């Protein structure tokens, strides 16, 4: 079987369609910020990614590498990320806990009346531009 470059890119995108959509959204947000601030070249973008966001960072970086070639503003940029811990609060005892370790059930009072406080977001933390 022969695989050309276009087939490979399609395979990458097909396996990470969620992340490609995020990259497109980030790119559009960066274009708006660049226009508002007279920025012509973005060198580095740092994201904060929630640990329970469902985002696969490796896929996100792959999609960034693919998509940035289509956008002159970010074509020389790198994408970095930091994790945001997943924290849940219990509505019964009002204590917070690590969502990944304990899930939905509060480890203190065993209640399932809990709410995720943080950890499912994806934020642009910092942009390095010229």
Labelled PLM ranges:
Residues 98, 111-115:
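Short functional micro-motifs and their immediate structural scaffolds
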Residues 114-126:
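Short metal-binding segments enriched for Cys and/or His
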Residues 90-93, 106-109:
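Short cysteine-rich clusters marking metal-coordination/redox-active sites
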Residues 88, 104, 122:
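Cys/His-enriched microdomains
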Residues 78-86, 95-100:
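Short, flexible, mixed-charge glycine/proline-rich loop motifs
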Residues 2-77:
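Long, charged N-terminal interaction/targeting segments
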Residues 48-52, 82-86, 127:
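Short loop/turn motifs enriched for small/polar and acidic residues
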């Amino acid at each position: 079987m022969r695989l050309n470059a276009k087939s490979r890119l399609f395979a990458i995108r097909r396996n990470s369609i969620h992340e490609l959509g995020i990259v497109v959204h980030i790119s559009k947000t960066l274009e708006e910020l660049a226009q508002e601030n007279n920025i012509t070249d973005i060198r580095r973008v740092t994201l904060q990614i929630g640990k329970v966001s469902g985002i696969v960072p490796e896929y996100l970086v792959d999609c960034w590498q693919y998509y940035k070639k289509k956008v002159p503003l970010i074509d020389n940029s790198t994408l970095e990320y930091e994790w945001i811990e997943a924290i849940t609060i219990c509505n019964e005892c009002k204590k917070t806990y690590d969502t990944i370790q304990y899930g939905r059930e509060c480890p203190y009072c065993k209640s399932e009346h809990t709410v995720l406080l943080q950890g499912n977001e994806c934020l642009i933390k910092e942009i390095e531009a010229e």
